[in-house]
Design a protein with these regions (language model features):
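Proline-threonine-serine-rich low-complexity tracts
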Residues: 1-193
Length: 193
């Protein structure tokens, strides 16, 4: 409150109070009209806070509604809130785009061999987002017939990146039979055998 004094110079004086009201009703203004997308293949663990300006002296507090890390494939919209500390806020949104476009690493699979039969074990590989992946197949895992067979393994990272890798299964008997007895008894006859 300001008290004004009026004096007419003849000894007549009056005072009049006047209220001075300072009321910030202007919200902060974001420094960037739009926020650039934040992109990654697997996850976003931190976000860089944008800035805003205010008509009054003081700092603008910046917060967001994100739960970090952001790992969901696709677009997550983060809302930033600028608060001038005087009851005025402004919001601005920013897209966080997670898009895994990298295939799993193609493993080099050794042939599986056996003489009478051969059984495959599902192989593994690595993925930039999925970590360790185990191959799947609709082919048989065990083979009991002589020959070469091909198992097609599929590695799917769950984000739309799928590779297939062949693996040979070779059943090849290379061992000669072993007699049940070490030596055979002589066969003798007088006329013929």
């Amino acid at each position: 409150m300001i008290t004004w004094t009026f004096d007419d110079g003849n000894g007549n004086i009056i005072t009049v109070p006047q209220n001075v009201i300072v009321n910030d009703v202007t919200a902060p203004t974001p420094d960037a009209p739009t926020l650039a997308d934040v992109t990654a293949e697997c996850e976003v663990t931190t976000l860089t806070a944008p800035t805003a300006s205010d008509n009054c002296v003081g700092s603008v507090t910046v917060t967001n509604d994100a739960t970090l890390p952001i790992t969901a494939q696709g677009t997550t919209v983060v809302t930033w809130t600028y608060d001038d500390g005087n009851g005025n806020t402004t919001t601005q949104t920013q897209n966080v785009v997670i898009d895994d476009v990298t295939d799993p690493v193609a493993p080099v699979l050794a042939d599986i061999t056996g003489e009478c039969s051969a059984t495959a074990t599902p192989p593994t590989t690595t993925d930039n987002c999925g970590g360790i992946l185990t191959g799947t197949t609709t082919d048989a895992l065990t083979y009991n017939t002589q020959g070469t067979f091909v198992i097609t393994w599929t590695f799917d990272d769950g984000n739309g990146n799928i590779i297939t890798v062949p693996q040979n299964v070779i059943v090849n008997d290379v061992t000669a039979p072993t007699p049940d007895v070490a030596t055979l008894a002589d066969v003798t006859a007088e006329c013929e055998v």
